[in-house]
């Protein structure tokens, strides 16, 4: 006879099924809809039904869950359990919850999907029960359901969790935990449930990380020796770190947490603990700023644990066990923190990262030795055998990305020989170059549907490019020599294919890329080939400059239609893509990667054209049309909204044509101040009799070496209440200082940009070096931008620091006189105020420029009253000094602010909006309008108060815009009586907007 589980015969199953329905029939009731539902409040009947369900389920396992009897019974079983749980009879709900757990483990999620909402609704209220035998199985059952909830149902499930205050209940349970009152298992299951909720629903995270009591409990629990408690806490921290605000909160108080995390990553910890430790570190490193914050606290120990995890593993019967593979994958993901600059790079080399990476490429690497005296030809032959063996293919892309990032961030003086890692590094370079060469040879055969192969091709190609561009002369030259050797056979033939493919894209008339992976490999290949002189000459003869320029122009026209360029495995899993509240610095090769690779190739060709023997006059002697087109396109990219990588390389190439730096709006404003001597307080006198007028505060920030020693810093500051008397200090310059070179240096100091003729270049370089103008010197020397460098800002906000505040010549006073906890670090004044500089204020505001020049009494006072709140004044000052208006709190911080706090934020922007009209600052007014409307988009309930506020300032454009945001909720506002507070004119305005919204199909 057939059996279902453990010897249970069909007859026995039928008997239990009969008993099940005998019990269920005691509670079936016919409802109004004439539908049969299970409804019985009798505790004994409920207990009998639960036991009958349990006995019936004992006959089955997940493998036999397709049995007709169980499939036909699911609806009735689920209905009975939902009602019993909903009745909240403590004597039976614990038993029922345990049966739900067994049901979930046996029946596939696809079959139980229809009942998930009802089960969630019945289980959630029971979590607040203090009975261990009730709350524990309810937490386990609810977690099992939530893990398998379909994305289409997530909104409905969250509504139930929110209504039942599920997060509040679980947080409360965790807060009362102690080893004496509740078991470790209880804490683990509650923590696991909360972790699952935070993974799926970002809305839940704020109430967790913003709960100091809970965070204190977690810190206390994490210090206990029980590994089960530690792993549960790690899971909670990991889910919490999906929120950027939560991650920062963890890091702000993070030393104990980080110590625990790294301790769990050690070899002595359990596999589960090690994986959770690695995952937490990855999530804390989601953003550049947060990653560096973590690294500054535990750099060496974090890197040591990561590298040792990557290098210490073993094969079982020639294979890597699944749990070891999972551990290696997580360690490799964490090692991708090498994509950012920082002190951690030193420790990766210290702990022999090359050796660890090579062990993931070469099978039985530790039992082999690399002969340091073999020829490059022999090394390539060995590398071919290694790549053909295809050892651990799923990790290969991580290997190439990690070594590529390490190479890109090396220092110029880096020398692997001294670090004892030369042989391993050399062999990795050879393997990467060989893998890249194979990708180029594949040409049209590259298949982007094969994700593993595609990611290998892309990441190896990019790694070689990073090696070639490495600041380390050792790595860069090694990569070039190796690649040149490997490309000798069939090099020009393969290159010709790349040229043809790349020239086809802009000439095809299409607006999408024909093959994303092939385009990536082609562009990276173009850049790598261009770095080798003989191939650069070949490309130039094939009109490579024109082809790349055409591609850049095509990209500019079609960038909205171009998708991602990466097939490499991401450090983020599907759940980690549910991050919130993160402000992440873009990776260089994430945004506009195709454009970046094209510009890298263009940079190599331009460099070769200027310095190559055969093409020394390539650009200067050709028709001016190419040069003009090239410079125009590069300026558009440099000044556009593209990624930092393309903008940096556009600026780098422009340096060959005499254009240095980046044009900023703030820089243009400051240049106006430089050209206007009205506010200058220092004059540089030259031996020739000429002079240059400057502003001490700007020079102190941007080029302090030009200041007399006593002017650079001031130990204390006092603000005079007397009328300001401007004095001009005269400084005699050495006769050795070239006037034009110094003027160009000053232009760059003020604006961040300068155009220099070749005749002045040689004199400007030593001056820039002496004055420590690093960015300018880098461009004058035509050094490649360092991978990952951000666009240099004009750091005028430094003028507001205590060290330089003695240059302040005006105080801004808000309309508020009492601000809680106000304390000025700059002076002894106790009322709210902000120190500032007339030159900065007048450069950004025509009204203030005219006021300070008017000769009226106000123009001489050291105080200027500004009709905005203290919060508004801080935002206004920030705009003057950075040309950026600070944004209000974002993400879950904004969503969880009360209405009053949100209105305070909005009021500051409305005040500045009104002031900017009076002070004739159209750009600032537009910025304010954008922020205000963005806030109303996410909180339409603020529209009425915003309308009232804007109307009080007679800001009718803003009133109209706010009315449009209130239009979708007009009927709700009318019924609630909120419109009764407004004037009839304003109500009519909202009503009209609502009618228009309705007519447009809203």
Swiss-Prot record:
UniProt keyword Coiled coil present: no
Domain notes per entry: The BTB/POZ domain mediates the interaction with some component of ubiquitin ligase complexes.
Protein name (record): BTB/POZ domain-containing protein At1g04390
Keywords from the UniProt entry: Repeat, Ubl conjugation pathway
Functional description taken from the UniProt entry: May act as a substrate-specific adapter of an E3 ubiquitin-protein ligase complex (CUL3-RBX1-BTB) which mediates the ubiquitination and subsequent proteasomal degradation of target proteins.
Organism, as annotated: Arabidopsis thaliana (Mouse-ear cress)
Residues of the BTB domain: 680-758, 808-889
Coiled coil: none
Pathway: Protein modification; protein ubiquitination
UniProt cross-references to InterPro entries, sorted A to Z: ARM-type_fold, At1g04390-like, BTB/POZ_dom, SKP1/BTB/POZ_sf
GO terms of biological process kind: protein ubiquitination
